[in-house]
């Protein structure tokens, strides 16, 4: 029999294991009770358990393993190795676990608390409170984390707009109420801030329930989000479910299912709209790859698990709306090395209605939210859904910005003055559109000192139409930067002109003469890196 603690020489657990590697079934001793077993091998997060007598626990059934001086370890069955042994994945640290430890099958899958008792709470993958609040009542209702998607006849199509108040989203990549949207971006481009702003929008606009699944993210970010939600007053209608990056892969892999079980309860039993936010779905795939390796499966492309497509589909298909209640999913997706052809990214993208692409170049220029207006898209951008006027403005905005990008190499080499009059005019309007599509967020008020702005779709369309028409050609670009509506920009422009007039008057009175004011076409306060030659 192979050494139960054998490794591959690098500290990683050997993947080549079979039923003969489980350990001697006689180690079970006298544990002949129904559902009772003994640990016969421990390899990191993988625990092999032998049962003597009675039926084996079913796949996905939960097992509890008492540990001296610590909370019991919860594990989940993932393979039947023989007629008397199973392989389980521990959802917590296995330190202190030893061969021969007693194991008890629970008779069903992991069950987590649901209902009003979990609102405003931070939970682990098993539903245990992770905040400084009181323990949950023993009689709180619980639901299994494993469940099928609603029947097709029960599902409702997502064709109603989910207005976010974020201009670039509502105009160019509108979200569906009851649909799925994903934000794709590399590290440090603002995915988490964007998720928090959407939670704020849900609470303010729809008075619904928000369920946030933190999958494999930093503990510091999770703590900051908890404090921010408390400070902003949105925590009372939000449930936070965390599986941090320091936790075993099994916990990170099952966190989305725990969040889904809670969201499904409010959808089915309370008929309430739910905003389900997941940050980060790539970490779910990553945890699945770790689990696959621990269970001895051969990897597929780029080291991902061979079941990548089916695992992503099983998760995404459960996110569904029914008559009377909608589950709207917003998913942050990390793009490794900014490679949008990565198998994990393409597998997730196949299931979403709206794709929001966050651009590192936009972030470098200070254009926040750093959403690429050309690469982002939505199936809802259709005249039958949003109307002809909306689609016409969105198409023209994309065309103008895309043409400006095509001219940027020429501008960098020769300068903007070498362009024709029409192209110079288009470049000016494209730059003003880019700045108008920025806006301050409510969740960043404490850092920027600028009040957040939520803009109606009609105001966004009217503002973009005015810029495309040339109504703002003589405005400073800085007047359109980080504002809400065009009226806000108009007031900002008027204030800047008044300030220039006062400076000119003061300069004339002192004899210095005019000529020290900023260029009214470009403004003096534009974001770093936003000059024409960039």
Curated annotation (Swiss-Prot):
Name under which the protein is recorded: ATP synthase subunit beta 2
Recorded superkingdom: Bacteria
UniProt similarity note: Belongs to the ATPase alpha/beta chains family.
Disulfide bonds: none
InterPro entries hit by this protein: AAA+_ATPase, ATP-synt_VA_C, ATP_synth_F1_bsu, ATPase_a/bsu_AS, ATPase_alpha/beta_chains, ATPase_F1/V1/A1_a/bsu_N, ATPase_F1/V1/A1_a/bsu_N_sf, ATPase_F1/V1/A1_a/bsu_nucl-bd
Keywords: ATP synthesis, ATP-binding, Cell inner membrane, Cell membrane, CF(1), Hydrogen ion transport, Ion transport, Membrane, Nucleotide-binding, Translocase, Transport
CDD domains: ATP-synt_F1_beta_C (cd18110), F1-ATPase_beta_CD (cd01133)
Membrane topology type: Peripheral membrane protein
Organism classification: Bacteria, Pseudomonadati, Pseudomonadota, Betaproteobacteria, Burkholderiales
PROSITE patterns in the cross-refs: ATPASE_ALPHA_BETA
Subcellular location(s) per record: Cell inner membrane
Principal EC category: translocase
Keyword Transmembrane: no
Entry GO CC: plasma membrane; proton-transporting ATP synthase complex
Annotated spans, Disordered: 494-534
Cited SUPFAM superfamilies: C-terminal domain of alpha and beta subunits of F1 ATP synthase, N-terminal domain of alpha and beta subunits of F1 ATP synthase, P-loop containing nucleoside triphosphate hydrolases
Binding site for ATP: 185-192
Transmembrane segments: none
Basic and acidic residues bias: start-end ranges: 494-505
Assembly and interaction partners: F-type ATPases have 2 components, CF(1) - the catalytic core - and CF(0) - the membrane proton channel. CF(1) has five subunits: alpha(3), beta(3), gamma(1), delta(1), epsilon(1). CF(0) has three main subunits: a(1), b(2) and c(9-12). The alpha and beta chains form an alternating ring which encloses part of the gamma chain. CF(1) is attached to CF(0) by a central stalk formed by the gamma and epsilon chains, while a peripheral stalk is formed by the delta and b chains.
Chief location category: membrane
